[in-house]
């Protein structure tokens, strides 16, 4: 039951966080920053907090899965068919997901420090709970360094998603992409039904 719930958190997290990724991509194409903020007003801060909550949920779920696979040694993961490439593949995907979630939180933390310093490019959004916990790590940095960290986190997340999208097609997680078309095109008629 616990693994199913953790998988659900990861799945829902990635579906919903893709709305924020859409904004990342549009900001990159249009040369804007936080494109949806003026459109959503106060709801934007709520949305970003929801995205951050889901990012932390994904992060915690991935850490739990790493612990199950590598520390607890759950019996089904010790079988020969799940050793070698299968184990490495699963661990790579979990680590990549953790890093991508940290990139979102780092971007938001540095973004809000810059906004608080009055940088014209950055919008003060209101309190962002989870990224505010990371802000003390970055507050001593100069504004130029913060911009570099924020931009690196943004680019890393975009490049990471694109690389992940390619990698997944070669991994055991291809079902993530195929689930929707497989469900959409599935035959709903009972097997063996007479025409």
Residue positions per predicted region:
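Membrane-embedded alpha-helical bundles of multi-pass integral membrane proteins
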Residues: 1-195
């Amino acid at each position: 039951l616990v693994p199913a719930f953790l998988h659900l958190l990861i799945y829902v997290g990635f579906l919903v966080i893709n709305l924020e990724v859409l904004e990342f991509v549009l900001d990159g194409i249009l040369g804007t920053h936080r494109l949806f903020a003026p459109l959503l007003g106060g709801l934007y801060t709520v949305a970003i907090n929801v995205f951050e909550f889901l990012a932390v949920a994904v992060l915690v779920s991935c850490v739990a899965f790493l612990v199950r696979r590598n520390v607890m040694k759950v019996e089904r993961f010790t079988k020969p068919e799940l050793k070698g490439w299968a184990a490495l593949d699963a661990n790579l995907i979990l680590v990549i997901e953790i890093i991508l979630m940290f990139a979102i939180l780092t971007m938001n933390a540095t973004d809000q420090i810059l906004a608080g310093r009055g940088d014209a490019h950055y919008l003060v959004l209101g309190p962002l709970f989870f990224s505010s916990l990371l802000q003390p790590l970055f507050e001593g940095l100069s504004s130029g360094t913060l911009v570099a960290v924020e931009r690196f986190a943004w680019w890393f997340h975009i490049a990471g998603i694109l690389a992940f999208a390619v990698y997944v097609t070669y991994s055991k997680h291809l079902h993530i992409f195929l689930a929707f078309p497989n469900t959409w095109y599935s035959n709903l008629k009972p097997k063996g039904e007479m025409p």
